[in-house]
Amino acid sequence: MCGIAGQVGRDPRTIQRRYAAYCAMQQTLARRGPDQRGMYICGAAALIHARLAVVDLENGLQPMQLDWQGETYVLVYNGELYNTPELRAALVARGHSFNGHSDTEVLLHAFAEWGANCVPRCNGIFAFAVWQQNAGTLFLARDRCGVKPLFYTQAEDSLIFGSELKTLLAHPAVPPRVDANGLAEVLLLGPGRTPGCGVFQNVRELLPGQYACLLYTSPSPRDS
């Protein structure tokens, strides 16, 4: 079990001044990823990871970066792929090479090769985010069964996401405010909740099998 989080916005200055917030968000993920922590802050994007190291301890560090065909891809990922060998073989046939044997690296190359079409190719449980540095786009995806959680909200003219609700609430731009719908979720459905509901005001959950492409601040969720 790992944890991911991040913020991507229109104005790089917003991202650059929020380092303390990112450290606080990362701290909320400590129980999910006690072994290693990583952070990527560049331009209008910040990606955060807390890792439970299971496979390829040296070469599986995140955020993981790949330069491929003129684009720079940065990945944070929580999950496990069950068809890693098959994906790796298909990617090697297309000219990709690998530094290690982690499924993280395979997923990153898969996105670089197939984009959003990599999601239906992945057999596993996952939630991940990929930042395309040159294109200025963020991609979020979640597995079909929704085993791995992923929440998001819009604030500061940006998108803020994380593996847990408390991760988002650690950001000062996300107030812990529960509206009428959220209160109904807690009182009538708790400890369960409606799929997609984040309980807190303006907080949503990416649905199982859904992905979202974000250019600047216009997220467009789609079902895979």
What are the residue ranges of the model-derived segments?
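A short, hydrophobic C-terminal helix/tail in secreted or cell-surface proteins
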Residues: 219-224
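Cysteine-centered catalytic environments shared across enzyme families
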Residues: 1-218
